[in-house]
Structure formats: C-alpha cells, structure tokens
A protein has these predicted regions:
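N-terminal acidic, glycine/proline-rich low-complexity segments
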Residues: 1-255
Length: 255
C-alpha cells in the first residue's frame, strides 16, 4: 500500500474486520494517507428505518454477520474511519435481499467453467442446506452456532423462498422450490465499480459524506435489480471463461 498514490486505495471488506482493525491500529498514518474509501459488507444501527447516531454523532455497526464475527474490531473500524474523515460505503443485507439470485445461477457457473464453477456450486449447496437447518434450530444450540436469533425459519422462508413455507422436506436445495440465494460479496464489489446501479443513502459525519446502501427493506438502495443481477452474473461468468481459457492455453503449452 505504501507504493500506490495517496488517496487511491478503495478497501473492500467482505468478512470479519479483525485484520482491518489491526492494520488501522498499527499503521494509522499510512491508512489515512492512502485510503480514498472503505466499502464494508455489513450494516449500521438504525431506528425506525433511520440511521441512529451515537453520542459522538457517528454511525455504529449493527448485528450483521460480518460485524458479529469480531464486534470489537467492527466497533473500532467504523469509529476510526469516521473520526479520520475517510468515506465509508456500507452495503447491508437489505440490498442483498432485494437482488436475489435463483439457484439456476450456480448451474450457469458450472456450464461456463467445469472446475471453478462446479466448485462454487458444490460449496454453496451444503452451505444453504446448513443455513436452513440452523434457522430451524433452537437458540443456543450447536446446530444454530453463531446464527443470530433473528434468523428464524420464518426469516429464511421470507428471504429465500418468497414467503412460501415448503413444509417438512428432506433438502432445501430444490429447483422446484424456487429458492433464492444472495451474492453479498459481488454486490459490495459492484457498488464500487458500477455505482450507477445503486441508490445509496448519504449521510454527512463531521463534514465527510458516507453512504449506506440498503437502509431498510423499503429502501434497498438498488436502482434496478434485474440490471444489477445481469451485470453481476455476466461479469462472474466472463471471468470464469477467461480463467478456463487461460488454463487451457497453459496446459497446451506444457504438452
């Protein structure tokens, strides 16, 4: 990061914030000098569908999964960025829920690249099955794990199945159920490279403008879900095709 121009780095954070907090604590001058924006797949505390500010007038992290992985680090990162006047863009689950992908998306990845695409599909399927079981498990159980208590069976049905409860079933990964999935990380990336596809809520903190994409369900922060879904799908498939083509060329050269 030291070698790039000042104010040229957009930091994309798609998981827990432990490493990011460590970076900012250990290298505050460097981070302040180089970062132009930090895009977080997370969420901020809201009240009555409005951003709730703390006593300092700053936004605070909510119970989003990425924030909950390491709440202390999340608190530090959100607070530090605002105190240093580094613009934040926070994309929430509301944005993801408004841009759902059906499971046919994963089959299209398999067709575009037999290795990586199949690997993505084969990891997503058990992950979705596990989430379904966790959402049905009681609070505090081993099966539920770290899944927040708000994530109940009803939550899963509403978010993934358009409110249609499948009843007692063996497997949830079934095309006939029209189950949806969410591309949290690609959405966060898209919010930076295709900003015209989003409608963020803007909030000024200490004269610095920040963005929240997906303030609430009625305000998901997406301009057109169909266009955004197509853009993400096409870019992922094109990337897989490029990788596949490159691998084939390398294999040809080696033989």
């Amino acid at each position: 990061m030291e070698k790039v121009p000042d104010k040229s780095v957009v930091l994309l954070l798609n998981s827990g914030l432990t490493d990011t907090a460590e970076l900012m604590k250990n290298n505050p001058p460097l981070c302040k000098r180089k970062l132009s924006r930090v895009a977080i797949m997370g969420g901020v505390v809201c009240e009555e569908e409005q951003i709730k500010l703390n006593a300092k007038g700053h936004m605070t992290p909510d119970d989003a999964a990425n924030n909950n992985f390491d709440p202390e680090s999340a608190e530090f990162v959100y607070e530090w960025l605002q105190s240093q006047n580094i613009p934040m863009s926070v994309l929430t689950r509301n944005a993801a829920y408004a841009c759902k992908f059906d499971i046919g998306f994963y089959e299209s990845l398999v067709k575009s690249d037999n290795t990586i695409g199949r690997g993505i599909r084969d990891r997503q399927r058990p992950a979705t099955e596990h989430l379904w079981k966790a959402a049905n498990a009681p609070s505090g159980s081993e099966t539920r794990g770290t899944l927040p208590d708000r994530c109940t069976r009803k939550w899963f049905v509403d978010a993934y199945l358009d409110g249609i409860d499948p009843g007692k079933i063996e497997n949830i990964w079934d095309p006939t159920l029209k189950i949806g999935t969410f591309q949290y990380d690609p959405l966060n990336v898209a919010s930076m490279v295709r900003p015209e596809l989003f409608v963020p809520t803007k909030i000024t903190v200490d004269k610095t403008e920040h963005q929240v994409i997906g303030l609430s369900s009625p305000e998901p922060g997406i301009a057109n879900a169909d266009n955004l879904r197509k853009d993400i799908r096409d870019n992922i498939i094109n990337a897989l095709k490029l990788v596949s083509s490159s691998d084939q060329q390398n294999n040809t050269c080696e033989t």
